From Swiss-Prot:
Subcellular location: Cytoplasm
Broad EC category: transferase
Protein name listed in UniProt: Acetate kinase
Gene from which the chain derives: ackA
GO terms for MF: acetate kinase activity; ATP binding; magnesium ion binding
Active-site residues per Swiss-Prot or TrEMBL entry: D147 (proton donor/acceptor)
Amino acid sequence: MKILVVNCGSSSLKYQLIDMTSEEALAKGLVERIGIEGSILTQKVNGEKYIIEEPMKDHKKAIELVLKALVDKEHGVISDMSEIAAVGHRVVHGGEKYASSVLIDDEVMEALEDCVKLAPLHNPPNIIGINACRELMPKTPMVAVFDTAFHQTLPDYAYMYPLPYELYEQNGIRKYGFHGTSHRYVSSVASEMMGKDLKDLKVITCHLGNGASLCAVKEGKSVETSMGFTPLAGLAMGTRCGDIDPAILLFMERELKMSPDEVDTVINKKSGVLGISGVSSDFRDIEGAAEEGNKRAKLALDVYHYTVRQTIGAYTAVLNGVDAIVFTAGLGENSAASREEILNGLEYLGIKIDAEKNKQRGKQIEISTEDSKVKVFVIPTDEELMIARDTKEITAK
């Protein structure tokens, strides 16, 4: 059984064709600059690159070219489109309606449109991608897998903001959380590595990329997460500010005479480690600058590590203890220095790190010592595989 996994952005599209027998990706691809001059599709099969450069006015044209690349006689991996058993779509926001993945029909599409107000940047391109696939592959079942779904198990006291209750009832203003597919994947892998049932474990998962969030997993369910109503909340990130005093935004508008759009740009695109360091949003650049003595770069890293450490401490309280901590995503998988800094100061939990194992980059590995009271893992995330598994399970029903 072969499943196509699609992740649509506003002008880009990532895809993988996964053979579910071996759970291996037969092809991985990226389409860039959709609707802009210089559109390009890059597909990788066994390390070999295949490139298509031609105008793509919209996502429908992009998906046409994806299918063309997959069945290409020389560079493709299937002989006919009918080999694609189903398509799994990453959808950022499922609102309160969806606590799990769902088979897409017209009713689901209406519900996705209703969620646009909650994710105005992300859901529209997700919807466009689904519509394009449905048009080009009308007989192929499609499944929506939501970033928010895993966190729908949060208790009401964890997702409710202390605002007038009507804002929640009438406008859906509450904590939703994101990166759910990643948190779900790495927590399940951690339980396998420990040889235990996830339902018997208390796990804190740290998805640390340019966007970053933590999740507290108890009895296999998300009970707390750091992102909120939007992916802006929680930790300091690459360019996002994370949790700040909301009155700062009013100060920026009233005293600094900034428009809402200008404030939005500052808190989403000019803040985080980029804002503090003035160097970059790329942690490799900031680590390099800090090593060369750049004080603001060092401060940016200190702030970042502090917010992650602080949140791990809080989630230990939420869970009443912790059995395992997992690091994943770009920084979590590749920065030994960041992992070490984050865990410094958590010795009271009985965490002990094996310095040699911690030097490994991008590998699935346990980095804690044998006598560490808390297991610490680095687990490369695989959201596409999780989407494919859900798609297989739902279309088999």
